[in-house]
């Protein structure tokens, strides 16, 4: 009481004591004033865009804010993203694990090489801690819907981890690591077995309807993983569990994506099979073969057709021993006979011969081109012959060499005089002789051509007068003096022409253009696979079912060869094997 009274005034407010000195370091964050700031998304990303961006200030940092100038300088950079993600998985904190799996999922989709299982060997064991517990959860999917939040979180994290592995399995390095892991392969077979229970109606385990969504997603990821590893566990022996389970699912499912994935897996499981060894394909029954062959009827689905042909190719490949087994089914034989020739031209634009059948061929009329607007040029020899003549013989000879008498034709007087004057005016004056005057030259036209006359034509609309020479027009080619004098005496109509045999004076005979028939230059993927499969069938023995089949469809194949030239090379083996049948 005494101590309290001595330190407390009458108003009850304690008296502040002097701060005691301490050797402990002062925390700078305790004295820092909290100032609210606004940070845009571009600033937080470290890039400045828009009008403020320039060559000197491309990168933008949060350190530009004044509030960050007071931060301690003695700081160290944190761990990189991949280490941070791995530490989050190991933390055991649900929020951290979910964040980490989400980040890994993004990497597996956009940059799988960054988290390759070969370069980061610790990742697969971490993912397995979320995937393997799914077996226990799947065992309970036959009872009731998952209501427990903890179980739901485990299921979602397991599905995310499985999806990450599914994405990484598309990389060659990563899938080679997965194949070596027995637990992963055992998990894949476990999920496939559960789906087989659903397919076969096994009473021991049937999926509860409310859990179908989760199980369907799980099955899709598992089938993708199976497709990725199937090439590495081939060839499948006769009683291979993977092969048998996949066949059971194939006969049950109607899911297109699953069917294609299963067919690819089955094809890869048969790779490297040997004729002298028992194979998983020996267990296939006619029902399954007929189902796979029936997929060839779906002309709108190229992926499914290719997957089916790939499987059939691998099925009969080892020594071509199973060709007879394939054609034992009449249904398979009929479908193959109906579809294979058509698949050779799948998605290929074949020539349209109907255009030629409908097109009427017409010859274009041979018409004389319109008369030239200027007199023809004179050869040097003809010019010298005319130049030596005196007037009016020179003008008369020039008119007959360069013009022809045409009854309905006309040529302006001024153009006629200028053409003559431009040819001979200067050379004649330089020789000391005189050119025939223009008036006399126009009068002389009647002497050169009996039916030609200088007339004046008045336009009835405008009243303008045109001074023309009626009855002549320029020739296409100048004649010699003797030929010109002879031809000038016989006038012709405007519909006829002199020297019709001269190809330069008339248009050559030609027909109207016909539609162009275009032949394809490339084969489609389906066509290539069909060619490969057909060539394999043709390798059967002469009395085998495959050879008989190839012989039956040969006329149809020849028709395709005529329409699609690239098929000639692709089917060269088939044509060689069937030539002597």
Curated annotation (Swiss-Prot):
Main location: nucleus
Keywords, in A-Z order: Chromatin regulator, Nucleus, Phosphoprotein, Transcription, Transcription regulation
TM annotation in the entry: none
PTM-bearing positions, type Phosphoserine: 44
Manganese among keywords: no
Record bears the keyword Transcription regulation: yes
GO terms for cellular component: chromatin; RSC-type complex
MF terms in GO: DNA binding
Origin: domain of life: Eukaryota
Signal peptide segment: none
Subcellular location: Nucleus
Record-annotated DNA-binding residue ranges: 395-476
Gene Ontology biological-process entries: chromatin remodeling; nucleosome disassembly; regulation of DNA-templated transcription; regulation of transcription by RNA polymerase II; rRNA transcription; transcription elongation by RNA polymerase II
Region (Disordered), start-end ranges: 1-23
Assembly behavior: Component of the two forms of the RSC complex composed of at least either RSC1 or RSC2, and ARP7, ARP9, LDB7, NPL6, RSC3, RSC30, RSC4, RSC58, RSC6, RSC8, RSC9, SFH1, STH1, HTL1 and probably RTT102. The complexes interact with histone and histone variant components of centromeric chromatin.
Similarity comment: Belongs to the RSC9 family.
Protein purpose: Component of the chromatin structure-remodeling complex (RSC), which is involved in transcription regulation and nucleosome positioning. RSC is responsible for the transfer of a histone octamer from a nucleosome core particle to naked DNA. The reaction requires ATP and involves an activated RSC-nucleosome intermediate. Remodeling reaction also involves DNA translocation, DNA twist and conformational change.
Record-linked PANTHER family: AT-RICH INTERACTIVE DOMAIN-CONTAINING PROTEIN 2 (PTHR22970:SF14)
Note: Present with 2610 molecules/cell in log phase SD medium.
Protein name as annotated: Chromatin structure-remodeling complex subunit RSC9
């Amino acid at each position: 009481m005494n101590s309290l009274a001595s330190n407390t005034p009458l108003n009850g407010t304690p008296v502040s004591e002097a701060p005691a000195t301490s050797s402990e370091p002062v925390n700078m964050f305790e004295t820092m004033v909290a100032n609210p700031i606004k940070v845009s998304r571009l600033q937080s990303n470290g890039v400045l865009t828009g009008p403020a961006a320039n060559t000197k200030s491309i990168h933008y940092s949060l350190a530009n804010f004044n509030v960050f100038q007071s931060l301690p300088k003695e700081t160290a950079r944190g761990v990189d993203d991949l280490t941070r993600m791995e530490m989050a998985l190991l933390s055991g904190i649900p929020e951290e694990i979910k964040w980490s799996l989400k980040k890994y999922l993004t990497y597996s989709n956009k940059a799988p090489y960054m988290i390759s299982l070969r370069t980061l060997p610790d990742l697969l064991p971490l993912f397995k801690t979320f995937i393997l517990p799914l077996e226990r959860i799947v065992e309970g999917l036959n009872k009731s819907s998952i209501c427990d939040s903890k179980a739901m979180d485990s299921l979602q994290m397991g599905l995310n981890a499985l999806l990450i592995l599914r994405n990484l399995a598309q990389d060659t390095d990563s899938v080679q690591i997965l194949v070596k892991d027995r637990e992963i392969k055992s998990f894949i077979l476990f999920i496939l077995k559960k789906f087989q229970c659903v397919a076969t109606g096994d009473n021991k385990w049937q999926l509860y309807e409310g859990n179908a969504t989760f199980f369907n997603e799980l099955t899709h990821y598992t089938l993708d993983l199976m497709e990725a590893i199937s090439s590495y566990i081939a060839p499948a022996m006769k009683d291979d569990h993977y092969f048998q389970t996949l066949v059971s699912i194939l006969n049950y499912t109607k899911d297109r994506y699953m069917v294609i994935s299963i067919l690819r897996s089955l094809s890869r499981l048969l790779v490297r099979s040997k004729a002298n060894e028992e194979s998983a394909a020996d267990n296939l029954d006619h029902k399954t073969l007929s189902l796979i062959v029936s997929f060839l009827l779906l002309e709108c689905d190229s992926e499914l057709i290719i997957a089916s042909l790939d499987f059939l190719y691998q099925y009969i490949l080892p020594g071509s021993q199973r060709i007879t087994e394939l054609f034992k089914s009449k249904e398979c034989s009929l479908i193959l006979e109906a579809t294979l020739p058509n698949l050779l031209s799948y998605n290929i634009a074949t020539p349209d011969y109907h255009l030629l059948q409908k097109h009427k061929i017409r010859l274009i009329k041979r018409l004389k081109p319109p008369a030239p607007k200027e007199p023809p040029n004179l050869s040097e020899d003809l010019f010298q012959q005319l130049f030596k003549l005196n007037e009016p013989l020179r003008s008369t000879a020039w008119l007959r060499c360069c013009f022809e008498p045409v009854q309905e034709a006309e040529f302006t007087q001024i153009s006629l005089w200028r053409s003559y004057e431009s040819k001979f005016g200067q050379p004649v004056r330089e020789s000391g002789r005189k050119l025939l005057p223009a008036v006399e030259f126009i009068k002389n036209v009647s002497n050169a051509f009996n039916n030609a006359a200088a007339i004046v034509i008045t336009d009835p609309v405008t009243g303008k007068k045109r001074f023309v020479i009626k009855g002549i027009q320029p020739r296409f080619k100048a004649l010699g003096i003797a030929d010109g004098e002879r031809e000038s005496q016989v006038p012709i109509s405007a519909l006829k022409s002199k020297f019709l045999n001269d190809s330069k004076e008339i248009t050559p005979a030609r027909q109207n253009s016909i539609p162009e028939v275009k032949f394809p230059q490339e084969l489609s993927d389906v066509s290539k696979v069909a060619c490969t499969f057909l060539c394999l069938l043709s390798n059967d023995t002469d009395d085998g079912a495959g050879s008989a089949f190839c012989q039956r469809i040969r006329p149809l194949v020849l028709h395709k060869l005529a329409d699609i030239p690239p098929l000639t090379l692709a089917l060269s083996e088939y044509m060689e094997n069937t030539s002597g049948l």
